């Protein structure tokens, strides 16, 4: 028996079937490093339109988690796809390096009593160490960026730039000093930004407190009574008993109706709508004596329950009827609404009582409770109220309450003297920061679109921004305040520039070690040098200033604005927010043109990642066991607009999809063995119809892929490319061309035609997957035939396609119909195989009974229809000629009959043909194979 294997064009490639990503990816990283890929991209990008994705800096503390990986991979997919689209898309990674978590870590290690300058030195060293660890992990993910020169907010140039940004805002009239209630953490010993507050359930003491009337005659008159015959008082409800010692007013709504209720031994003032519920809660019976609108109660005084002072009634629109009594007790030092209400009635800062110190302990001079921690004082205050007969009800409730995001401990509002960025104070051009920011939001593209309403609502309702902190490790607020007037030095902006120049040389230590006389000369004795540092959200929120036009100028031809900021959905109140405010203050517009938001990672059951639940998946584990490309493929396949579910099972599905894409690429490479595009590539008009369709289909897909990348819908790219590999290629085209590829003469038009198509598809496919499967695309690139440069990323989208011309008989619609017919035939072939009626498909002969229009189209393929259906014979007959045993199909106007071939199997092509053995020199093979071996070769036109 002759061995015809040597006469076949069998696939051959060194491209490995087994990916071995954990071992092979580090080799690719070394390749990128050795060729200086990032530098080369900047060189070839000169003169191109820029696309700037500005990196929101992760905090330099701890290992990266899966959320960090998602964020960086999304950014990398955008930067890579924009590069392939012909943009110059630099990516400068950054880190947020100042702030309390690092300071807390250093204090935990070295103690709290070390000198401030040593604390800062150790914080800087710790942050630098953390940056290096995170950097290695990000690089391992395949993220392409300027890793040799990232930005760090603690770099001297950035610290100086931040001071200059603050100076711009001072110059614009946005910065002021004020006493206001701010979020305060006792454990931090500092004010917190809104983004540092999280809400958890907390058990609290809920109390109803009686304030005896001080102006009895006025109260009687307000209710139209001649006099009060019994002791009377107003009732408040609160969940913060610790604020009662600081009570200074009582708030009612001007439009609500209030009732004076006779309860036997005394009269209670309550909102009329809540009387029934309150009396039931107190276990009392009562009768309404009279009613009055809230506005009639204005300025009537009531006595504090246990201190010798009065609390007047103020009118306030924020009072509600959803809980309590309809009257709100007001402690202006400990509530934003309380503070605003009391200030509106003329209370000066000096008159505001603030007995709680920064550590949560009452001042020693406070009667009854001095020296007590407020949470521990709560039961003592409740007991005191009961003792003086002013406690009507006490119960414990569970409610959502603000906590520190670091310490997980309850926060309070606390009025302290702080530096603020004013939201509503008029700037020098007559606009407010709030107006500027809201206008900027309207000019910003949001992905997903709902982000616009979310950020708009936050800006519209937010208070002034407290930017000062009482910590060591932070960029200083370099102000000098006059000792008598408390005013800023008249040359503040000029002095800040001098400080910035010094910080540029020696870092923030230049300010902390500065002798004021060096800058102020003889004036130094008249001024205090303040010690406050800036909120870390100001650090990151001004990177558009101190990075994009400072340490790493982006040279954007459309001004100092990023095209895109991309972060998690929590950054609407974080980095997106602070950047918007500083950009609007300094430049009058947002520092970004677009905002992309991604959701948080959860497990397959929708639960948050938690060590206690055991569902945490570290990105390092994935890269070590499966490879970064599997993680990248999962990110691309997931709709990031909502929660992103990840688990080992989900990642395994991504690995399965990866194998299908890799196997498709390997098939293309193996069948391009010996193909030199410089001399073997056929012009489109010389290619077979099926091959022209395959190239045209790839062209259409590329247009869809480009559009999906441009709109950041990576899951669409994944779905379309994966489906193309599995369905159009694996399930149709590549299956059909195997016969022609393997059995036709090596240099025949028939074979070179399908190789030309596979070459075009391979050149395109490697680019489509490059933003997603960064490592695998680079590996494929090295194996593709023809001369090529050092990296797939040094190229743009493939341009070598030829579109099917108009009027082409075997057009797109034709091949769509053929695919449907082939699917119907495959279904019946499978049924016949399962019934043991045939062995393989090539043992089958098929007759297609088709309605005239379909029959006419299928007839265009002539004898080559059998190659498309991958059967040994195929005929087309009229639908009316179909016998009773012909099978109906899902294709309208088509019935099928499959029979087992009676002919001998060709030992070379495996087709069952009547001419096998007719050539005495080749008794085991068919006439077609004889022609392909020793003749001029068969001629194919279509498939």
Curated annotation (Swiss-Prot):
<keyword id="KW-0030">Aminoacyl-tRNA synthetase</keyword>
<feature type="binding site">
    <location>
        <position position="926"/>
    </location>
    <ligand>
        <name>Zn(2+)</name>
    </ligand>
</feature>
<feature type="short sequence motif" description="'KMSKS' region">
    <location>
        <begin position="608"/>
        <end position="612"/>
    </location>
</feature>
<dbReference type="GO" id="GO:0006428">
    <property type="term" value="P:isoleucyl-tRNA aminoacylation"/>
</dbReference>
<dbReference type="InterPro" id="IPR023585">
    <property type="entry name" value="Ile-tRNA-ligase_type1"/>
</dbReference>
<dbReference type="InterPro" id="IPR009008">
    <property type="entry name" value="Val/Leu/Ile-tRNA-synth_edit"/>
</dbReference>
<dbReference type="GO" id="GO:0008270">
    <property type="term" value="F:zinc ion binding"/>
</dbReference>
<dbReference type="InterPro" id="IPR009080">
    <property type="entry name" value="tRNAsynth_Ia_anticodon-bd"/>
</dbReference>
<keyword id="KW-0648">Protein biosynthesis</keyword>
<feature type="binding site">
    <location>
        <position position="909"/>
    </location>
    <ligand>
        <name>Zn(2+)</name>
    </ligand>
</feature>
<comment type="subunit">
    <text>Monomer.</text>
</comment>
<dbReference type="GO" id="GO:0004822">
    <property type="term" value="F:isoleucine-tRNA ligase activity"/>
</dbReference>
<feature type="binding site">
    <location>
        <position position="567"/>
    </location>
    <ligand>
        <name>L-isoleucyl-5'-AMP</name>
    </ligand>
</feature>
<dbReference type="GO" id="GO:0005524">
    <property type="term" value="F:ATP binding"/>
</dbReference>
<dbReference type="Pfam" id="PF08264">
    <property type="entry name" value="Anticodon_1"/>
</dbReference>
<dbReference type="InterPro" id="IPR010663">
    <property type="entry name" value="Znf_FPG/IleRS"/>
</dbReference>
<keyword id="KW-0436">Ligase</keyword>
<dbReference type="InterPro" id="IPR013155">
    <property type="entry name" value="M/V/L/I-tRNA-synth_anticd-bd"/>
</dbReference>
<keyword id="KW-0479">Metal-binding</keyword>
<dbReference type="InterPro" id="IPR014729">
    <property type="entry name" value="Rossmann-like_a/b/a_fold"/>
</dbReference>
<keyword id="KW-0963">Cytoplasm</keyword>
<dbReference type="InterPro" id="IPR001412">
    <property type="entry name" value="aa-tRNA-synth_I_CS"/>
</dbReference>
<feature type="short sequence motif" description="'HIGH' region">
    <location>
        <begin position="58"/>
        <end position="68"/>
    </location>
</feature>
<keyword id="KW-0547">Nucleotide-binding</keyword>
<feature type="binding site">
    <location>
        <position position="611"/>
    </location>
    <ligand>
        <name>ATP</name>
    </ligand>
</feature>
<feature type="binding site">
    <location>
        <position position="929"/>
    </location>
    <ligand>
        <name>Zn(2+)</name>
    </ligand>
</feature>
<dbReference type="InterPro" id="IPR002301">
    <property type="entry name" value="Ile-tRNA-ligase"/>
</dbReference>
<comment type="function">
    <text>Catalyzes the attachment of isoleucine to tRNA(Ile). As IleRS can inadvertently accommodate and process structurally similar amino acids such as valine, to avoid such errors it has two additional distinct tRNA(Ile)-dependent editing activities. One activity is designated as 'pretransfer' editing and involves the hydrolysis of activated Val-AMP. The other activity is designated 'posttransfer' editing and involves deacylation of mischarged Val-tRNA(Ile).</text>
</comment>
<dbReference type="GO" id="GO:0002161">
    <property type="term" value="F:aminoacyl-tRNA deacylase activity"/>
</dbReference>
<protein>
    <recommendedName>
        <fullName>Isoleucine--tRNA ligase</fullName>
        <ecNumber>6.1.1.5</ecNumber>
    </recommendedName>
</protein>
<comment type="similarity">
    <text>Belongs to the class-I aminoacyl-tRNA synthetase family. IleS type 1 subfamily.</text>
</comment>
<keyword id="KW-0067">ATP-binding</keyword>
<dbReference type="GO" id="GO:0000049">
    <property type="term" value="F:tRNA binding"/>
</dbReference>
<feature type="binding site">
    <location>
        <position position="906"/>
    </location>
    <ligand>
        <name>Zn(2+)</name>
    </ligand>
</feature>
<dbReference type="InterPro" id="IPR050081">
    <property type="entry name" value="Ile-tRNA_ligase"/>
</dbReference>
<dbReference type="InterPro" id="IPR002300">
    <property type="entry name" value="aa-tRNA-synth_Ia"/>
</dbReference>
<dbReference type="Pfam" id="PF06827">
    <property type="entry name" value="zf-FPG_IleRS"/>
</dbReference>
<dbReference type="GO" id="GO:0005829">
    <property type="term" value="C:cytosol"/>
</dbReference>
<dbReference type="InterPro" id="IPR033708">
    <property type="entry name" value="Anticodon_Ile_BEm"/>
</dbReference>
<dbReference type="Pfam" id="PF00133">
    <property type="entry name" value="tRNA-synt_1"/>
</dbReference>
<keyword id="KW-0862">Zinc</keyword>
